[in-house]
Amino acid sequence: MRSGGTLFALIGSLMLLLLLRMLWCPADAPARSRLLMEGSREDTSGTSAALKTLWSPTTPVPRTRNSTYLDEKTTQITEKCKDLQYSLNSLSNKTRRYSEDDYLQTITNIQRCPWNRQAEEYDNFRAKLASCCDAIQDFVVSQNNTPVGTNMSYEVESKKHIPIRENIFHMFPVSQPFVDYPYNQCAVVGNGGILNKSLCGAEIDKSDFVFRCNLPPITGSASKDVGSKTNLVTVNPSIITLKYQNLKEKKAQFLEDISTYGDAFLLLPAFSYRANTGISFKVYQTLKESKMRQKVLFFHPRYLRHLALFWRTKGVTAYRLSTGLMIASVAVELCENVKLYGFWPFSKTIEDTPLSHHYYDNMLPKHGFHQMPKEYSQMLQLHMRGILKLQFSKCETA
């Protein structure tokens, strides 16, 4: 009996061991064993602490190694983006001429940086703009900021003046016409060739307020890339003179063309040069006589002078700011979120694909009149600081 009891005890112990092994080593034991063996081989060459925990059979395969790796990569990207922002500051402050390829390489690097709106940066920059320029009160000429009897000096020809009499005064809105300010989402649409085949139209049209520059075409096939919604469009008086022949023979064509902008404001620099005044007033009279839906506004010369001084302190010293930079500056004051489309002063994409200067033609600006690379480096800085967002390529479509 004693030997029989010993045999039963031995059998019981073996069964217990077998049961424990089954509990200890589930069906994935072979794969886990390979992982453990690989871990033991790696341990001598600096295995991470997370991987060493695999030696505990009850510990699941950890994900901490990947998480740590991703955290490290994120930190590296953040540091590189900070360095890039510093480099942009240097780029805009230096006087030496940078090549187009230098800028394109910088933009390639910027695209690797995640973009997030930075509320504090935005508020600080907007406060500085408001302090110097005050678009809310002074962006356009109004009866409130320019009473009858004002002897208004021109923006560029500052020694020249125009007295504001009743007939001119009544062309002005009573106050600033942007009644829904601040707008949540604003799109400032430039005319760069980068917009061709961008498919940004739907995204642009979802914006609460859309700014456009210099009466660009927005109908037909162009609308899928540039959208059609327009709340404000600038008008360069030279367009009225050259394209529409001072609204004499081509008045009907002008009225037909601007009808595509719905009830948008038409913004003209009537008081930048004396030569602009008469033709700008003629646009106003033409729309009034034809009972058009669009309303004419005039840039306030004081606002433009102050804005030029603001950007001059940041290195933009060209003869005159581009319309795009003017409107982007206005948008920062009027809007909570600003996105720029079609701002691309380069002859090719970052993939080296040739581009036309505008999405509708290849007419180049006057040499030396604007300072596009300097302006663009400032816009890149605003992008990197989370103040506004630049669209560099095609838009994502649903």
Swiss-Prot record:
Pfam families from the UniProt entry: Glyco_transf_29
Stretches assigned to the Lumenal side: 25-398
Entry-linked Gene3D superfamilies: Glycosyl transferase family 29 (3.90.1480.20)
Residues the record marks as active site: 370 (proton donor/acceptor)
The enzyme's E.C. designation: 2.4.99.-
Keywords recorded for this protein, A-Z: Disulfide bond, Glycoprotein, Glycosyltransferase, Golgi apparatus, Lipid metabolism, Membrane, Signal-anchor, Transferase, Transmembrane, Transmembrane helix
Keyword Glycoprotein among UniProt keywords: yes
Binding site for substrate: 214, 236-238, 322-324
Residues modified by glycosylation: 66, 93, 151, 196
Function: Alpha-2,8-sialyltransferase that prefers O-glycans to N-glycans or glycolipids as acceptor substrates. The minimal acceptor substrate is the NeuAc-alpha-2,3(6)-Gal sequence at the non-reducing end of their carbohydrate groups.
Record protein name field: Alpha-2,8-sialyltransferase 8F
